[in-house]
UniProtKB/Swiss-Prot annotation:
The keyword Nucleus applies. Residues 1-98 are annotated as: Disordered. It comes from the Eukaryota. The TFIID basal transcription factor complex plays a major role in the initiation of RNA polymerase II (Pol II)-dependent transcription. TFIID recognizes and binds promoters with or without a TATA box via its subunit TBP, a TATA-box-binding protein, and promotes assembly of the pre-initiation complex (PIC). The TFIID complex consists of TBP and TBP-associated factors (TAFs), including TAF1, TAF2, TAF3, TAF4, TAF5, TAF6, TAF7, TAF8, TAF9, TAF10, TAF11, TAF12 and TAF13. Residues 35-44 have a biased composition (Acidic residues). Its main location: nucleus. GO terms for molecular function: DNA binding; nuclear thyroid hormone receptor binding; nuclear vitamin D receptor binding; protein heterodimerization activity; TBP-class protein binding; transcription coactivator activity. The lineage of its organism: Eukaryota, Metazoa, Chordata, Craniata, Vertebrata. This is Transcription initiation factor TFIID subunit 11. InterPro entries: Histone-fold, TAF11-like, TAFII28_dom. TBP and TAFII18 bind to distinct domains of TAFII28. The modification N-acetylmethionine is found at residue 1. It comes from Rattus norvegicus.
Length: 211
C-alpha cells in the first residue's frame, strides 16, 4: 500500500525531471542560436565592404569613361578646353606644314646645285667654329662668364655671318672676271658692300650730339 501511495508523487516527479532533462539539452541550442547573429553580422560587414569597393570602382570607371568620352567627343569639352585643344592642334599642323615646305624647298635647291656648289654646301654644313675659342672671345669682350647656350648661339651666328661674307666675295670675284680661290681683296670688297647694304653693323662708336 505504501508503494501504491508513493507512486503518484513519484510519477508526478518523474515527468518533472524528464521535462527538466528535456529542457536542458535545449540549452546548447539556444547558445547556438545566439551565436548565429554574430556570424551574420560579420558576413554583413564583409558584404558592405565589398559593396563599397564595387561602388568606388564603378565611380572611378565612370570618371574614366567620361574623360575618354570627352577626348573622343569634342562637344563634351568646355569652351576653354575646346579653344586650347584647337589652338595646339592648329599650331602643330602649321609647324608640320612649315617643316615640310622647308624640306621640300631645300631638296629642290640642293638638286639644282652644280658639283662645285654641292661640295661647298657640304663643307659649309660640316664646318663649325670651335666653341672653346668662341667662349674665350666672348669672355674677353664682356669680362664675365657665359653659359654654354650663349656659346652655341654665337657659334651658329658666326658661321652664318662668315657664309654670307664668302658668298658676297665669290660674287665680287665673278664680277671682276677673276677665278677662285678667293683673295683678301675679294673679302675686303665683300665686307664693304655688306656694310653699305646695312647687313653689317658699324663697329666704330659714334658720339651722338644733342642740339
Amino acid at each position: 500500500m505504501d508503494n501504491l501511495g508513493e507512486s503518484p508523487t513519484d510519477k508526478a516527479g518523474e515527468p518533472g525531471e524528464s521535462e527538466e532533462t528535456r529542457a536542458t539539452p535545449g540549452a546548447p541550442v539556444s547558445a547556438d542560436t545566439e551565436g548565429i547573429p554574430e556570424e551574420t553580422d560579420q558576413v554583413g560587414d564583409a558584404d558592405s565592404k565589398e559593396a563599397a569597393a564595387e561602388e568606388s570602382e564603378l565611380k572611378s570607371q565612370d570618371v574614366s569613361d567620361v574623360t575618354a568620352a570627352e577626348r573622343e567627343d569634342p562637344s563634351l569639352l568646355t569652351p576653354a578646353a575646346k579653344k586650347l585643344k584647337l589652338d595646339t592642334k592648329d599650331k602643330k599642323e602649321k609647324k608640320q606644314k612649315v617643316d615640310e615646305d622647308e624640306i621640300q624647298k631645300m631638296q629642290i635647291l640642293v638638286s639644282s646645285f652644280s658639283e662645285e656648289q654641292l661640295n661647298r654646301y657640304e663643307m659649309y654644313r660640316r664646318s663649325a667654329f670651335p666653341k672653346a675659342a668662341i667662349k674665350r672671345l666672348i669672355q674677353s669682350i664682356t669680362g664675365t662668364s657665359v653659359s654654354q647656350n650663349v656659346v652655341i648661339a654665337m657659334s651658329g651666328i658666326s658661321k652664318v655671318f662668315v657664309g654670307e661674307v664668302v658668298e658676297e666675295a665669290l660674287d665680287v670675284c665673278e664680277k671682276w672676271g677673276e677665278m677662285p680661290p678667293l683673295q683678301p681683296k675679294h673679302m675686303r670688297e665683300a665686307v664693304r658692300r655688306l656694310k653699305s647694304k646695312g647687313q653689317i653693323p658699324n663697329s666704330k662708336h659714334k658720339k651722338i650730339t644733342f642740339f
